[in-house]
């Protein structure tokens, strides 16, 4: 056999090759050696590893510091190292590199809920010298952040992204008139806390809606109001630096509001006044996401100052179905009236009711709940983060109380109906608290128009009918020009009795059913309305008279109809939806009365020609009404006809008396002619010719009187033959309204007009008296006016009738033509929006009409054999009228009624689980603290109780000869904010110029609901999952140095779901400014900022969501992934990771390369493969670190550490860094942290690791000339050792091991000069004999291959450099 040799020089380490195929350029095993250069020129030569040295940890005062506990995570930011440990306490340390030591400061020690099973992943951001932040996640707790330059942390929750609110603060907002500047509308305030450069909490408190309006009226949509809002703070949370005030300002109803960041105030602030001139406008959607969601992410990364978080758990638990059912069953619901000590009361001085009864100076808590209406009630709970839970449905409840007026001292106060919910079950309350909830409040689903029981509330007024028009149905009835209240006490004359009307308080009498409007009685002339009307009763004898002849002779006659009525409600006037009702099917009930306490009247008369007398007074108004609305018993009277013209009498034969003045009658509907007794002249002009006359009456009712439940009058009673309901309801229109035929009436559909333009002619009728055959009489006072003294029209509260008389025939000096009037009357007027309907007839065919009070006679009854001219077949006693008995003040009144439904189908969408899920819930009041019981008041409803000035009648045009303005002012429940009117004509004495263009100008924004924040119930079975392992969420883009850290606001507005078949998200990593996501069986690229952002139309930047920037994902591999994120290490060359599913160690740098397969370590990885995550105590999987200074990657396990060099792209050695929890670069140095101590790598003695000697060795395979058998003889190697810089000539390796599959030999390598020894050196080459097999110490190592190991086991600190080895063998 010849002696041969095989040379080995090493460029790496491999393990997978078969021993027979092993490459001599690779080591099979290496321990604590380097093939790359460190301090010397040793690249591709083997050198032993230089060990580490401990770096002292000192406090700022120089005292040594001991790190407490197990290291869970670390972060390096410039010269700072942040350590997170779990020990006696949970600790956060900041270590500042001072060169020779680390100055160590404990930033926090306490309970942070750290766990060794949940190591910490972190990233850091340097913003400026004062703001250097470390963000961390652990998959157990919510995401957290610490500014490591700050050292005054006191609370464990100071670090949470979603902050805890520690106190139950009280915040009250009130309006101050007269300073500041706000655009009209409504405003609401929302409040958050924040720390400077840190997090902002959720909105923990919101105010009710406040009204931006003048002190006595609303504002027009274009107006700016001078007012401000005072905010009072009590017990703010001092753990925060600031409280931030937001305003939500709407200038039109349900429009996108203007949201303003008003002010940032120190938390010791007690008072702030918002004048509307400060602050910054922000995106309205900001408030929907402010504070963010509390999630516990497992991994995170960042790109372009945007934070990505993946595999997260929602920390806020849903309320279970069982607990919801328990809350519902334990809730005791009642209806209450807000008491005198409530924060908001609708109040006014009883002596100045009109001006003070104005609710816009308060807030939206003026709204209550409407009696008889059904509301869907729920409860929400607020946790200590300020976040509100999903809604817990309590049930559908009817409000059983009504707004109640009561007098308190000198003030009248309206008590507001509200719901109250009480929960007293201690088990239920504790279960609520166990979920972290501390507050509760009420929420409501308010009924929509379609869901409402009550369509509207308002007063009922009779209609009027012209005889001729009624017979022709052209129209059958028309809107009454006067509102015609019911009288308190009246005895009415019958058709032939001749009894005068008795009116104790001077009311106008012609308001009862079927009564003619007019009279031949001079004692009632001041209450006449139509100059050409004679008061012909509407009954006739069909057997002797033809109905057509009857009405043809009565073209100017009108009657009052209480069977067909109009309903006047603010909901109809101000809600467009109620102005389009056609044949709506509703029911009617009378719930009370509104009593008139005063009337404000005025009149204006303009003539086109002068007075007849040269010096006559002409228009004389006198005293027509009180000048204020203080309460009285005379509210039922009004201005109708009166002696308003003072002029001479025209005689045929002039005499000295013709210069004496008399007062002349002026009527609401006055003739087209002279205001005195001048007829049509044969030549010249007519004196005192009427050009324009306006009469206005504002009837004022201070309060309502509600009937007890048992006295409420129903138009329809099941099984009652006399109460058969009402016809379908129609809304007012400009033109014809057709009232459907009344049941049991034998009549067809009836025509109705609200707006009238007609001319009334005189019939020269003799049905009343022969004296009228030539015309209607012209009336004047009987006596002359002397000394310029004219009596007031209403000079006596008891009897307001002024003595009048006709011009007697014996005054022969008056021409016959001047005793009578024959000119027609122009009747033109319009009505505001209202509803019209008729009562169905009784089953016996009688007219059902409005009820009377306390059995007062309420209608004109026909005599025997007479019938209504429009219904000759009417039964005996053609009218049916109920009487409602109640005790009240003796005042004129209107019936207060409601249109309602009692069979609403699928209210709120139904009561199924699905319907409840689809409901939108609005908050109804502030929160209350959850104590031993829960007491919730629903302080914000949907119903206003306010004054409605109903403009019933107004001028057709401004040029009409006769015009009437009729207004009824009364309190009413409404779904619209009536006080939102912005005209200046409220409560005026003079209403002559009033029309819809300047009266009741309504700004709908004041009816705005508190619906900026809306809520829903949640299907627990569907949404109880709070773990989202395959989801990524993205924050907004962060600006360095911003006051509030954007990254702390996790909105979940943008999420990206990855493929579920690839397992949960394990790690998010950024490489080359691209985000990559590892799943157990997949690797994907998250496409972020891959296309141009698109700005919004108004130029505002995209906020809240980066939805246009995250465009999806692109999978790089559907099979290769990573289950243990701690095995991932990032370097400029790529991402290193171990896939426990495929048993490989990979490098990803645009493509995935298996380094373990390529470089011969697949089997090694497979042998140590486990399917558990790394954690610092058990260390049962790999933890990877990257040394950026030396381009080495360390794959660390609990019992070994594999090093990969990027310089040579090879695995180089196993290092004694096993079980090290952290290795990191600080500046240009590389450090390791182990056992509570900091170690600087490569700064200690050679072979000394963490204060202990660790051997080094290199193992290779000699397998030349395979498959020939060989006898291994000697090994030669070139190697040198140094002690510092001193060459040691007799030291290299101290052990040689050789083995194959059946032999093993070992020998110590000692070099004895001059003596035989296993190791000899000649010409700088070391030679050693291959040891014999230790089995018998005789056999040579013989095989086709052999493992050769050179090692140094003797403790020393020498540097050794090994160049190559040559194996001599016989073959």
Curated annotation (Swiss-Prot):
It is found in: Virion. Keywords: Viral tail protein, Virion. GO terms for cellular component: virus tail. The keyword Cytoplasm does not apply. The keyword Nuclease does not apply. Disulfide bonds: none annotated. Its main location: virion. Forms the muzzle assembly at the distal part of the tail. May serve as the gatekeeper to control the ejection of the cargo proteins. Homohexamer. This is Muzzle protein. It comes from Bacteroides phage crAss001. The lineage of its organism: Viruses, Duplodnaviria, Heunggongvirae, Uroviricota, Caudoviricetes.
